[in-house]
Structures are given as C-alpha cells and as structure tokens.
Amino acid sequence: MEKLNLLGFLIITLNCNVTIMGMIWLIVEVLLRMLVVVLAGSPIYEDEQERFICNTLQPGCANVCYDLFSPVSPLRFWLVQSLALLLPSVVFGTYTLHRGAKLAAVGGACRPQVPDLSTAYLVHLLLRMLLEAGLAFLHYFLFGFSVPARVSCSHVPCSGAVDCYVSRPTEKSLLILFFWAVSALSFLLSLADLLWILPRRKTLRTTQWVNGEARPVCEVPAPPPCLLQNPQGYLSQGQVDQEDRQEEQVVPEFPCMWTAGQSDNSNVGQACVSGLLEHSDQDASEATSSAGDRLTVAHTAHELRFHRETSLDLGGKNTQADELSLATQSHLARHSSASKPQAPCRLTTSGSAPHLRTKKSEWV
C-alpha cells in the first residue's frame, strides 16, 4: 500500500474507544426502539384522533377532550426520544473520526497511534444518561404507564361532563409498557458502560504515569515506514545494491558463454547462434589462408631443394638448407598466428577442441 487505509484506521479508532456495552446499547436503541416505533407504533396510532369518540355532538368538544387526553402524540414523542438519545453518540463518533483523520494525515507513512478518547467517551455517557432520565420523566408526566379506555371531560365548549372513548386501549398500554422496558434497559446499559470505563481509565492513567509517556489503548498493525518509502520492500539499500551487483556478476561478458540449456527459447540464444555462424565463417577463412601459407612453404622448400642439388657440396649444403627451411617455416607460422583474428566468444561445445588440434598439427 502506498497510502494508509484511512477508513480502516477510523474503524479501528472507533473500536478501541467504544466498549462492548456501548455497542450493545446501540443495537438496542436501533432495533428495539426505532424499528418498533416505525413498524408497530405507526399502525396503532395512525387513526388515533379519528377513533376518539365522545358522547356529545357539541362542536369542538371532542377536539378539546382529545387535547387534554394526549397533549403530544406518543408516536412522535418516541421518535424524538430515540433521535435525542442517539445525538451524544453521533457527536462522539464525529469527534473520534475527526481526531483519527487528523492523526492519520499528520503521521504520513509512520505508524499512527490510536488516540485515547476515554474522557470524551465518559462525557458522552453522562450526557446520554441525563437525557434518558429526563425523557423518561417527561414520558411519565405525559402518558403514565397505561392508556385508559374512557376519559371524562368537562372543559369548554363542552356543555357538561362528557365521556370519550379511546380506540385499542389495551394494545396501546402494552406498547407503552414495552417502551418503558426499553428505556430501563437503555439506562442500565449506560450505567454498566460507565462502571466499565472508569476502572479502565484509571488503569490507563497509572500506566502512563509509570512509563512516563502517553500510550494509546491499542495500535494499528501498520507496516514500518521503510516499507512505504522503499519500493524494494523490507530490504535495505545495501542489500538491494548487493543483489544488483550479484546479478551483474552472473551475466557473462559474451552471450555465447551461456550453456545451451540457458540460451534456448530466448533472444540471447539467438545471439549465440549468430555468433557461432560468424565464428564458423571466420574458421573457413582461416582454413583458406592456412592452405595458401602451406602452398607458399611448399614452393619455398622446392626452390631450396633445387638450389641445394645444383650449387654446393652435398654435406654442407644439406645442413644449411635444412636450417634455412626450418627458419622459413617458423617465420611463416608466427606470421599466420599473428594475423589470425580472435573469436568474439569462447565456444563451450565439445567439437571445437579437435578442430583446433587439427589446425595446430597442420601449421607445424
């Protein structure tokens, strides 16, 4: 990875600063409160005012009695209660993501440390518990614990005591009791979370004081900075240079020094084949030049023998002629070996050695 996975770091930051009790509370809040409000409360209270019937035909009396019975719709109150209790958690999550993103941006390629946000988590817990208690008190003041089947009303514009009847009172009472149970469970989970975080925060402070440095709760298992900066991975620069030198030493000076198994199916093998063809052409030219040299030597020897037979004495003439013949042959052999061009590369085949021995015997 060239860059740090920001999303993964933010998720780990939230995971390290939120306890298991906080996660359970969030599940209870979403599943047992908000979904029940939407799926169960909405069908029950959708015709609440229409089914609220009073035993009078006085205009406006039914509306006044219903307003006294239910100043606030329970469905709307429960929805507002759920959103209000989620507000501290949303604020804490936003603050955690902001701190995590800031640390990740400043850290760069170095390993970022998860910030310790136990103080902010404690403040958010206290605020959530206060909201839970306040909304529970308001819920009791508005709705109580049950829904009556009949309501008496004597306010203006009613002409006297008027009885009004509520639709589905038992079902509404059960739903109210369910939300009371959810509120109690939510408060207990918040209290357990508070008791969970206090010893943990005290232990963290003791650890920081003993070590003399601020330690995070947990760390992200990120790769070391050298891996992010060095494209060769965990190898150091010296190891990389050593490997490069070894690779340069392995490559031979001439492509033809490679064996046949290494040069097959490669461009280098084709280069070696072309080098071998050029070397065979050079061998043919060398053979032609050596044949010409042998003809010259033979012609010179024939002249020497003719001169020896016609001019000087047989004993002294033969000795001088042999010495002159040997000197001439050695001079021509040195001249032919000096004029021979070197092969561009050494052959590794087994057939080259006998060929060279044959040429050497021919020169001698």
Curated annotation (Swiss-Prot):
Record InterPro entries: Connexin, Connexin_CCC, Connexin_CS, Connexin_N, Connexin_N_sf
Q: Which Pfam families match?
A: Connexin (PF00029)
Domain of life the protein comes from = Eukaryota
Keywords of the record, alphabetical order, are:
Cell junction, Cell membrane, Gap junction, Membrane, Transmembrane, Transmembrane helix
Where are the stretches annotated Disordered? Answer: 331-364
Which cell locations does it reside in? Cell membrane; Cell junction, Gap junction
Task: State which ranges are Extracellular (membrane side).
Answer: 41-76, 150-173
Q: What sections of the sequence does the record tag as coiled-coil?
A: none
Cite the record's Polar residues compositional bias ranges. 331-340
Q: Could you list which ranges are Cytoplasmic topological domains?
A: 1-19, 98-128, 195-364
Membrane topology, record value: Multi-pass membrane protein
Q: Which residues cross the membrane?
A: 20-40, 77-97, 129-149, 174-194
Biological role: One gap junction consists of a cluster of closely packed pairs of transmembrane channels, the connexons, through which materials of low MW diffuse from one cell to a neighboring cell.
Per the record, the similarity remark reads:
Belongs to the connexin family. Delta-type subfamily.
Quaternary state and interactors:
A connexon is composed of a hexamer of connexins.
Name the record gives this protein: Gap junction delta-4 protein
Source organism of this protein record: Mus musculus (Mouse)
- The coding gene here is Gjd4
